[in-house]
């Protein structure tokens, strides 16, 4: 993770990926996500890069990679000595069989991938800055895990304790039931919107 790294990002995607790396002075390459590739660019279209960002389900398109598609990205990362930064913020909305909720559903991904996730989508924690990052020990012989731990303990003291307790409650039996109820409500709203767009003949992702 140096200033000289080349960064590969799908286009369109969550803009912070680009902004963060522009501020660091890194070279940015764009991988078009289009209707032709179902908004899911694959590694056979990708140039060499040191780091690739994958947001799945994607913000803003909602397109979601299957486990099989992510296998190809993991193989690409190994062949290119690259690291995948996998943003799983919207994984809680994945219900279709075969679609991935985590990059680590792919065998070997722990050797090339870092996963980040947020409580803002699954539990409505928007604004509390609470989430988690998984940096596997298998990645770069554990060096990145140690570097990340040192960085976090030096520059960040964690979110407020009351927020941590709220996040802890998310994973209780009662918390998961309540969250599932809310997610079902969101999905119903999405279905209503999709039906209205279909009726009006409006194309959407």
Role assignments for model-derived ranges:
Residues 5, 26, 79-83, 109-111:
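A short helix->loop->beta-strand "cap" motif at the edges of active sites that frequently abuts
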Residues 16-23:
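Hydrophobic alpha-helical segments in the ANL/AMP-binding
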Residues 29-104:
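Active-site phosphate-binding strand-loop segment of PLP-dependent enzymes
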Residues 187, 201-205:
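Conserved PLP-binding catalytic core of the aspartate aminotransferase-like
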